[in-house]
Regions:
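Aromatic/acidic polysaccharide-binding cleft in carbohydrate-active enzymes
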Residues: 251-300
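Short, internal active-site loops enriched in acidic
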Residues: 37-41, 94-97, 151-156, 194-199
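Short secondary-structure boundary/capping segments
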Residues: 47-52, 103-108, 163-165, 205-209, ...
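Structural recognition of the beta-strand scaffold that forms the well-ordered cores
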Residues: 4, 30-36, 40, 87-91, ...
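Short amphipathic alpha-helical segments and helix-helix/interface helices
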Residues: 17, 73-77, 177, 240-244, ...
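Active-site neighborhood of glycoside hydrolase catalytic domains
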Residues: 124-146, 153-263, 274
């Protein structure tokens, strides 16, 4: 989206961004979701530390990629100038490949952008990777309001992905919250970030609730683990009410849907009606505090 926006003239881009984000001259959109590293719409697969550093500092090679420097950050700065209260949530599609293993018991390396598990030995290092990202973005004038530990943690097949069932996300979330606390970060953590039907994996049903129960409420940074995020690529949105009823103390947000095609405008009204019913109203009426769609601006 940011690449496409940067292909516009500055005047046209400014007019469009005002139409979307301005609270006085536009729709007042107040939340944006970005990837922490590459996503399935990026120019290529990458993370911010593709080459491992020394054993004493494995993420010493951390650096933002050109996608962020050339497109994402400039666009975010323009949006923030229009709406300074914009909230930004970031999620990784994959960790660096050198942190991946085929399974957490044998810990055999997994040299692939797709699938794999986070090596338990690198949970703390990966948490520090998040901290570096948040601090670097802050230096650029961009505050990261929230993160999720992993985009679609039950999706093994995405071009950039990491399999992270609740049994593995739970201990990582504790490391992540502790690192945020130690570094005086107020960044919120939304767990899960995937479908209503948990990709039909039996022991992953009610993923957020199982994760909350596993980590408990008495650990460093526990107050930063505020809720769960959902997508709608499988299952029924009634799952939102079910999760709320089990843990009414935790927030819910709806963090991703792809709203499909409009057939050059022929199906626009039908599409907008369906999106209002299923994406907007069905989520906020079932306890979601935010609704985000994916992607903002594609060229095809």
């Amino acid at each position: 989206s940011c690449y496409n926006l940067m292909q516009m003239t500055p005047e046209a881009r400014q007019a469009l961004l005002k139409r979307i984000y301005s609270t006085t001259e536009g729709y007042g959109v107040s939340y944006a979701r970005i990837s922490l590293g590459c996503n399935d719409f990026s120019s290529t697969e990458y993370t911010y530390c593709d080459t491992k550093g020394s054993e004493s500092d494995p993420i010493s090679n951390f650096a933002l990629y050109s996608d962020e420097n050339d497109y994402v950050i400039p666009v975010l700065k323009e949006i923030l100038a229009i709406n300074p209260n914009l909230k930004i949530i970031a999620a990784p599609w994959t960790c660096p490949k050198w942190m991946k293993v085929t399974d957490i018991n044998t810990k055999n390396p997994k040299d692939s952008w797709t699938d794999g598990h986070l090596n338990p030995d690198y949970r703390e290092v990966y948490a520090k990777y998040f901290v570096k990202f948040i601090n670097v973005m802050k230096e650029k004038g961009i505050n990261i309001y929230a993160v999720s530990p992993q985009n679609e943690p039950l999706n093994k097949a995405n071009c950039a992905s990491l399999y992270m069932p609740w049994q593995e996300e739970a201990p990582f979330v504790k490391k992540l919250a502790a690192q945020f606390k130690k570094n005086n970060l107020q960044t919120k953590i939304y767990v899960f970030d995937h479908n209503y039907n948990y990709d039909k994996i039996a022991d992953q049903e009610d993923y957020p609730v199982k994760l909350y129960n596993a980590i408990g409420d008495n650990f460093e940074g526990s107050e930063l683990v505020v809720g769960a995020a959902y997508h709608d690529y499988g299952g029924n949105n009634s799952e939102l009410t079910d999760i709320h009823n089990q843990r009414p103390d935790k927030e819910l947000i709806f963090s991703e849907t792809s709203i499909g095609t409009w057939k050059n405008g022929r199906d626009l009204s039908k599409r907008l009606m369906a999106d209002m019913k299923n994406v907007a109203l069905a989520t906020v009426n079932q306890y979601c505090k935010a609704v985000l769609v994916w992607n903002l601006m594609l060229d095809n």
